[in-house]
A protein has these predicted regions:
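Nucleotide donor/acceptor-binding cores
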Residues: 48-49, 106
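Conserved Class I S-adenosyl-L-methionine
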Residues: 3, 32, 163, 167, ...
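Conserved class I S-adenosyl-L-methionine
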Residues: 1-47, 60-61, 139-167
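Short catalytic micro-motifs in class I SAM-dependent methyltransferases
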Residues: 115-116
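Class I SAM-dependent methyltransferase SAM/SAH-binding core
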Residues: 50-100
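A conserved beta-strand element that flanks and buttresses the S-adenosyl-L-methionine
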Residues: 112
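A short glycine-rich, Lys/Arg-flanked "PGG" loop and its adjoining helix->strand segment in the class I
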Residues: 124-136
């Protein structure tokens, strides 16, 4: 088990929102489709009444699903702080772990796991649990990043591929097909620009490879890097 899917390490990382916010700042310079819009659209297609979001973070997506889809949304996260932030948005939120969901079979029309399944201590167990709590005609919407996501910045600090775990764009489909009968992959490509060395350094310093940030060379021009993520719509 690595730090990316060690429950204690994950709870420490998300004990407050500062590191998460620093990583999300890169979205301000992103081009191409907004991956979170693709996730939201995939959920909206299902016209769900009951939605579970695991790994809810600060609760932006959960709040939007509740408001715009008029769905009952339950949000779950390992981090008490993230649950607190989500609850402050008026969303029902609880502390919990995706590998042991505290819900009855078939409780939800749709489950959402956006950029979090690489944190699962046991990926297959997490997928078993997500399938269990989704109704027979329901779905899972999962999202993750490619091993080559933001590759150019990682190469500058001597990393081979983006820091990740056992759930990447490249490995997700076979894992999902072990538990779901139909899996549709929706790729999203674009770029992210780090306008200065300081911006790139701040991003790296708030990831699991923070110790590599000081390897970043001086940048004479803004650093434009490629982005590749994918959303998977999975039916039982």
């Amino acid at each position: 088990m690595s730090s990316i899917n060690d429950p204690d390490a994950v709870r420490r990382e998300y004990a407050d929102e500062k590191r998460y916010a620093a990583r999300m700042a890169k979205q301000e310079t992103a081009t191409g489709p907004d991956p979170y819009e693709v996730v939201f659209g995939a959920v909206a297609e299902q016209e769900p009444q009951e939605v579970l979001e695991v790994g809810c973070g600060r609760g932006e997506l959960a709040e939007r699903m509740s408001r715009e889809l008029r769905a009952h949304v339950v949000a779950l996260d390992q981090s008490a702080r993230m649950v607190e932030l989500t609850a402050a948005r008026g969303v029902e939120a609880i502390v919990g772990d995706v590998v042991d969901l505290p819900f009855r079979d078939g409780s939800f029309d749709c489950a959402v796991a956006a950029w979090m399944l690489y944190h699962a201590s046991d990926l297959d167990r997490a997928l078993v649990e997500l399938r269990r709590v989704v109704r027979p005609n329901g779905c899972l919407v999962a999202a993750t990043s490619s091993e080559r996501n933001l590759a150019e910045v990682w190469e500058l600090v001597g990393e081979i591929g983006a820091p990740g775990g056992g759930f990447t764009v490249e490995s997700a489909e076979p894992a999902l097909r072990r538990h779901f009968g139909h899996v549709e992959q929706r790729d999203v490509f674009g770029t992210v620009t780090f306008p200065t060395r300081e911006a790139a350094h701040s991003y790296i310093a708030n990831t699991r490879t923070a110790e590599t940030a000081d390897r970043l060379p001086e940048l004479d021009t803004p650093l434009v890097v490629s982005r590749h993520v994918a959303i998977f719509v999975c039916a039982r």
